[in-house]
Amino acid sequence: ITAIVAEPRLGAYLKPEGEVAEGADMPAYERGDKVVPYRIIDRMKGADLVGIHYDQLMPWVKPTEKLDDYASEQVKAYAAAHPDKVFTGENGKDRFVEMTSAAFVVIPGDYVTTEDGTGIVHTASTFGADDAKVCRDAGVPGLYLVNKQGETRPMVDLLGKYYAIEDLDAHFIDRCVDKAAYGHHAGDYVKNAYDPRFNEGGKWDKEASEKAEDLNIVISLEMKMEGTAYKIEKFTHNYPHCWRTDKPILYYPLDSWFIRDTLDKERMVELNKTINWQPSSTGTGR
């Protein structure tokens, strides 16, 4: 296989004694060998990699954007240049564009370092402000599902499980979903903490859910067997949890309302003074 890694991170994955000189025969590798033979075939700057496309590691769903008043100019331009990728939802009115050829490409990001990992990070525009910004600037589409109401939604629903196929738009399924690959885990909970098996009677059995194998492990092993994961390890790292339930938080791209209250600021301050705050400091200085 051919792999890419930031040079300062090479030693974290491969041992110096495993390097094979140019022109020398590559030794055979057997599962369990302590040393992995490798050869450095080229050295490049990160900027040299920008624009290179790669295969989608989990090709369950093709990247799709909605064509509406909120679509970016880049999405509209892509749709105009690729009319064969545009389709209408089963409701007959909502329009979408499949954008696989604009995705799965190396893009630059100033928040990536060579201090951890490989110096190359996976970027998902629907899960984080940094990711969203660099993807938007580079014209990389999001990875959404389309439900029967014609709405774009993340692959995981608000209950914490992959959307069931029957809840998705039929035209979107035909154009953008590998039903066999996606259906393998459709309906599965991504975190055991949200699985009803560990929440009987409305009470979360934290100990049982943390002991049981969860979907992250299952998918990691599947990728290893398919040859799309080079190495799988367990790492202890910080992860945000809900302060009320102590359950791991799930990230979602959500529809949000933003209220412009500055127009009524003076009236709000005036009304605030009529409230008997206890303690009084609660109603001031904010």
Predicted feature residues:
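Non-cofactor substrate-recognition interfaces
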Residues: I1-R286
